[in-house]
C-alpha cells in the first residue's frame, strides 16, 4: 500500500533533557506531540511517538506537506521552542493493526536523521509534488542511507523561515 511517511523531532532535545532534566524533556515532548496532532487535522495520522520524535503517515505527499507546513508554522510561532527537523518519503509499505512496516518507513526515518534543525529533507517523489505546488525545493544530490541498498536523491523542502526557532535549547 502506498503512503507518505514522515519523522519529525526536535533539534537539541537530548541536550535540553540533559541540562534541564527528564521532567522538562517529557513535558516538551508531550507538548510537541499535542502540537503535531493539532497540525495534522485530516491530512495525516500520528502513528507513534518515541521521546521527542513523532512518526506520521498520510495518503499523499501533498497532504503530508500541508500538515508539516502547519506544524512548522506552529513551532516557529511558539517562543523559545526548539527547531524542528523532518524527513519525508513516499512509497510502499505494509499496514498491520494500525502500524506501518517496510523499507519506505525506514527510508523516511533515515532521511529525518540527516536533517538539521529547521530543515525538511525529502526524497524525489515528495520533492516533485512540492515543486508542482509552488513550494521551493533545493536538490542535495544522492546519498547513501544506512542499511538502504539504493542511494537516494535528497531534496531540501523550504517550508518555513527557521530563524524564529531556538536551536540551542540549553
Where are the language model's segments positioned?
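Juxtamembrane helix-loop transition sites at the ends of transmembrane segments
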Residues: 30-33, 42, 113, 140, ...
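Short, charged, solvent-exposed linker or helix-capping segments at domain edges/interfaces
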Residues: 164-170
Amino acid at each position: 500500500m502506498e503512503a507518505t511517511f514522515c519523522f519529525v523531532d526536535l533539534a537539541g532535545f537530548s541536550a535540553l533533557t540533559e541540562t534541564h532534566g527528564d521532567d522538562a524533556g517529557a513535558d516538551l515532548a508531550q507538548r510537541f506531540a499535542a502540537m503535531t496532532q493539532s497540525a495534522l487535522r485530516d491530512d495525516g495520522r500520528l502513528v507513534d511517538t518515541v521521546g521527542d520524535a513523532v512518526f506520521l503517515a498520510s495518503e499523499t505527499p501533498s497532504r503530508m506537506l500541508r500538515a508539516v507546513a502547519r506544524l512548522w508554522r506552529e513551532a516557529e510561532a511558539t517562543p523559545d521552542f526548539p527547531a524542528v527537523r523532518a524527513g519525508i518519503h513516499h512509497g510502499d509499505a505494509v499496514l498491520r493493526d494500525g502500524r506501518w512496516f517496510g523499507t519506505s518507513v525506514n527510508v523516511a526515518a533515515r532521511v529525518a536523521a540527516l536533517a538539521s534543525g529547521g530543515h525538511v529533507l525529502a526524497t524525489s517523489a515528495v520533492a516533485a509534488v512540492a515543486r508542482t505546488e509552488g513550494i521551493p525545493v533545493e536538490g542535495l544530490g544522492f546519498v547513501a542511507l544506512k542499511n538502504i541498498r539504493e542511494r537516494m536523491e535528497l531534496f531540501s523542502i523550504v517550508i518555513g523561515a527557521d530563524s524564529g526557532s531556538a536551536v540551542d535549547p540549553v
